[in-house]
């Protein structure tokens, strides 16, 4: 009798633990963040293609798309472009691009986007082709139509403030319901490389609202992971589906952050004697490069520390290549040879260990994430059916 009673107690303890775990997984906020980096966006595109393929395999559904699994997808610069591609709906209200379509997009359009304008007083590239192709691909779609919450950053040089385009901001700031092609060009309009972007929307009163925007990297310095987390936190507080989540409860956040590559020496190394001969333009190029790399490192350091402090280190995965060399470090080298190298970088990265202390490869970690994303989606669907 005592044995039976002990067994029943143990059974119900396991059942309670299992139910608690399922509830936590069901209420997890899933976040995808994609760095900026110009043509180096090919690297995270390879990672996204692998992840989407895993989700299709796990769920036995060739039509599965990343937007079906993430509550928030954030990006800056080229990461903002990827965000738009996988969240903007087509005529069937499905993402107009599958992850496997992104690399071919770079190969087809990259050489035209990064086609030197020949100007010695303006930006290196006139941006006309970039804006044209964005208009063709994204059409008249606006932020509110995105298939999941988005977080795309830019910076307004007239107001001197960051501008964050998200669906959840629209009730308070309807002027942020801009066309996706305007947002994508703005987040990619890196100073020196592309002209700033001017466009207008309207306020709730019908008044004209002006935007004068440059690259989102000015606002997030290349890595939008913290921005994406903050949007996810607000979403969790406002959406009844996440009622158990407290502010900044990273235990119930699942974050995948994709980099566009750097190296341990911040892309390039310089000596004091070398830098002493630089003029203003050379310094601007170097500072942008150094700042992006340093900020990306510090963002990763902060987020990983916070997740570890909350015993949730497995909820955060940063996928980054830290050993780029030669032309692969350049954000605007869209030669076919360099793009092929970037594809190789992404494919090789999948086979590399996540850290020096872990034998788990990025490929294995992404498979683990795919299983979590799939299980969570099924739990959500089961709850909705009751």
Swiss-Prot record:
Presence of the UniProt keyword Transcription regulation in the record: no
Motif mapping: GXGXXG: 36-41
EC number: 3.1.1.-
Entry's Gene Ontology cellular component terms: vacuole
Known tissue expression: Tuber.
Enzyme class: hydrolase
InterPro entries in alphabetical order: Acyl_Trfase/lysoPLipase, PNPLA_dom
Keywords, sorted A to Z: Glycoprotein, Hydrolase, Lipid degradation, Lipid metabolism, Plant defense, Signal, Storage protein, Vacuole
Residues in PNPLA domain copies: 32-229
SUPFAM superfamilies given in the database record: FabD/lysophospholipase-like (SSF52151)
Domain comment quoted from the record: The nitrogen atoms of the two glycine residues in the GGXR motif define the oxyanion hole, and stabilize the oxyanion that forms during the nucleophilic attack by the catalytic serine during substrate cleavage.
Similarity comment text for this entry: Belongs to the patatin family.
Function, in words: Probable lipolytic acyl hydrolase (LAH), an activity which is thought to be involved in the response of tubers to pathogens.
Other noteworthy facts: Patatin have a dual role as a somatic storage protein and as an enzyme involved in host resistance. This tuber protein represents approximately 40% of the total protein in mature tubers.
PANTHER family (UniProt xref): PATATIN GROUP D-2, XYLOSE ISOMERASE
Protein name from the UniProt record: Patatin group M-1
């Amino acid at each position: 009798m005592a044995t039976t009673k002990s067994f029943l107690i143990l059974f119900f303890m396991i059942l309670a633990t299992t139910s608690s775990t399922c509830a936590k997984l069901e209420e997890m906020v899933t976040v995808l963040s994609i760095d900026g980096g110009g043509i180096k966006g090919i690297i995270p595109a390879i990672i996204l293609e692998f992840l989407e393929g895993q989700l299709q395999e796990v769920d036995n559904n060739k039509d599965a798309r990343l937007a079906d699994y993430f509550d928030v997808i954030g990006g800056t610069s080229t990461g903002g472009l990827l965000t738009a591609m996988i969240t903007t709906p087509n005529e069937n209200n499905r993402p107009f691009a599958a992850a496997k379509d992104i690399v071919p997009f770079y190969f087809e359009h990259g050489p035209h986007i990064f086609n030197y304008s020949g100007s010695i007083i303006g930006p290196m590239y006139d941006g006309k082709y970039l804006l044209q192709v964005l208009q063709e691909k994204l059409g008249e779609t606006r932020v509110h139509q995105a298939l999941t919450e988005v977080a795309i950053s830019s910076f307004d040089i007239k107001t001197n403030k960051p501008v964050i385009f998200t669906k959840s901001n629209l009730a308070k700031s309807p002027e942020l319901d801009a066309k996706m092609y305007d947002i994508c060009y703005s987040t990619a309009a890196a100073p020196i490389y592309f002209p700033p972007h001017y466009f207008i929307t309207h306020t709730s009163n019908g008044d004209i609202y002006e935007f004068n925007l440059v690259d989102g990297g000015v606002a997030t310095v290349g890595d939008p992971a913290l921005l994406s987390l903050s949007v996810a936190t607000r979403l969790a507080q406002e959406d009844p589906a996440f009622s158990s989540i407290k502010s900044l409860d990273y235990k119930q956040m699942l974050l995948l952050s994709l980099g566009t590559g750097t190296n341990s020496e911040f892309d390039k190394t310089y000596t004091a004697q070398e830098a002493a001969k630089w003029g203003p333009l050379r310094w601007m190029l170097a500072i942008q490069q150094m700042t992006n790399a340093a900020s990306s490192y510090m963002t990763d350091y902060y987020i990983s520390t916070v997740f570890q402090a909350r015993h949730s280190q497995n909820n955060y995965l940063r996928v980054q290549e830290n050993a780029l060399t030669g032309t692969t470090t350049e954000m605007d080298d869209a030669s076919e040879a360099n793009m092929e190298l970037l594809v190789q970088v992404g494919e090789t990265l999948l086979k590399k260990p996540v850290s020096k202390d872990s034998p788990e490869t990025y490929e294995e970690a992404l498979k683990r994430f795919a299983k979590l994303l799939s299980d969570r989606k099924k739990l959500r669907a089961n709850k909705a059916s009751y």
